Amino acid sequence: MITELRSIWKEAFGDSDVFMEDFFSVAYSKDRCRTLRRDGKTVSALYWFPVFEGGAKMAYLYGVSTLQEYRGQGLAAYLIEKTCKELQAKGYSGVLLVPGSEQLFEYYRKLGFFACTAIAEKCISAAGCIQLRPIEREEYAVLRRKMLPYRGVEQEGAFLELLERQYKLFAGDGVLLCAAVQDEQAFIPEFLGDKALLPAVAGALGVRTAQVRLPGQGRSFSMYRPLDGHRPPLYFGLAMD
């Protein structure tokens, strides 16, 4: 089963073996995975993480994928619809996902999703330095809850285990971030706190430039499908995309 799921994932997304090993060792659960079989094999799959906004439990759908030779038959759409009904019966208030392209935004609109959050993306040049301290995911979760923007989505548990495998987690005076550093550039998929400190944060990471995702107006990022009428969130930051 896992071998089949890894094959589907690799063909659909091209992620590294290291990432797939991390995902299937710390984030995967058969209870949060749904599949379709055809011709004696698994051909389509999706996964989800439980997330929360305003006390409401939601699902972040992740890794929706179908083998190339079985695409165009509506399998993923069927699997999503079936999963949404199951999640609704389990008491989930809504479903979130992050499309990887404009074409996928259109695809998911046809399945009842609508764009609900946006992010701003900036390239920051290092200037100055502030003190950052590495932290573990448990502290990161506590601080993140306090610093999330209004109606932001809490993402914890297995998702943060996977995040910690892929990124370093840091806290400083008034800032919280996760970052991956390669050569002289950093990628910061989420930064919470005083944006004026970003140049000094880049300096603290020891890089010349940092690509940063920020809460705010920018490109559409996540989509939402309500299951019980609950309001859509206004911020969704960590996609692991």
Model-inferred region functions:
Residues 35, 41-51, 57-65, 96, ...:
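Conserved beta-strand in the GNAT
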Residues 9-53, 145-169:
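Active-site rim helix/loop that mediates acceptor-substrate recognition in acyltransferases
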Residues 87-100, 207-216:
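Conserved GNAT acetyl-CoA-binding A-motif
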Residues 109-128, 189-193, 199-241:
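Active-site/acyl-donor-binding loops of N-acyltransferases
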Residues 92-118:
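Long, hydrophobic, well-ordered secondary-structure blocks that form the structural core
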Residues 111-189:
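Amide-forming acyltransferase catalytic core, primarily the GNAT-like/NAT-type
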Residues 66, 72-85, 110, 193-206:
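Conserved acetyl-CoA-binding loop-helix of GNAT-fold acetyltransferases
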